[in-house]
Amino acid sequence: IEVCDWSSDVCSSDLKEGLRIGLPSSVQQCAISLGLIALLGIVNSFGTDTLTAYGAAGKIDTIIIQAVLTLSGALAAFCGQNIGAGHLDRVRDGVRFAMLVNLLLGLATFTAIYFFGDKMMLAFTKDPEVIRIGKEYLLIMGGFFIVHGGLNVFNGALRGAGDTLFPMAVSITCLWLIRIPLAYWFSSIWGRSGIWWAIGASLCIGLTITYIYYKIGRASCRERVFWVV
C-alpha cells in the first residue's frame, strides 16, 4: 500500500480534479430530489388517484430508465478511456452506437407500453381509475423515452470527457426553471396530463441544449472531439 503525502502537489491536484468532476453530480442529485418533491406537490393537487397513479407509473418509468442510465454510465467510461488513449474515432463510434441502442430501446418500450401498459399497472394496483391515469402517464412519457435516453447518452459522453458541470447546470435549469413552471402552467390548461407534457417538454429542451453544446465541441478543455459526431 502506497501512502500518499497530502501535502504534495500531485495529491492536491488529484483531489481538486476529483472534486471538480464529482461535486457537480452530487449537487445535481440533491437539486433533482428537491425538484421532484416540488413536482409531487403539483401532482398531489389533483387528488389521491392521480398521486397513486403517478407513484405506480413512476416506478415503471424508473425501471425502464435504468437501462438507459446503465448505457450512459458505460459510455462515460468508454469515452474517458478512449479520450485518454487518443482514440477519438472510437468515441464518435461509441456515441453513435449508444444512440442506436437508445433508439431501439425507446421504440420497444413504447410498443410494450402501448399494448401492455394497463397490465404493467396491475402489478401495483387494481383500481381501474388509477390504472387509466397511470397508463395515460406512461403513454405520454413513452413518447419521450428516446429523448430522455438521448439526453443521458450525451451526458454520459460529456462526463466521460471530464465535463460534469454542464450536465448539472442543464439538469437543474430544466427542472427548476422549465419543468416545474410549465407543470403549473400546463396543468392549469389541460389538467393533470399537462404535468406529463411539461416533463416531456423539459426533456426536449434539455436535449436540444446539450446537443448544441456537444456539437460545437466545448465538452472539455482537452480535445475538441465531439463536433464530428
Question: How should these model regions be labeled?
Answer:
Residues I1-V10, A219, E223-V229:
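Single conserved hydrophobic/aromatic residue that forms the stacking wall/gate
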Residues C11-A38, I63, A67, L71, ...:
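Hydrophobic faces of transmembrane alpha-helices in multi-pass small-molecule transporters and flippases
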Residues C30-K59, I63, Q81, K119-P128, ...:
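Helix-terminus/linker motif at the lipid-water interface of multi-pass membrane proteins
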Residues Y54-G117, H148-V170:
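Small-residue-rich hydrophobic transmembrane alpha-helices
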Residues V68, P128-L151:
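Alpha-helical transmembrane segments of multi-pass membrane proteins
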Residues A108-I131, K135:
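Short membrane-interface helical motifs at transmembrane helix boundaries
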Residues G117, A123, R132, L175-T208:
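Membrane-interface helix-loop junctions in multi-pass transport and translocation proteins
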Residues L203-R224:
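Multi-pass alpha-helical transporter architecture, strongest
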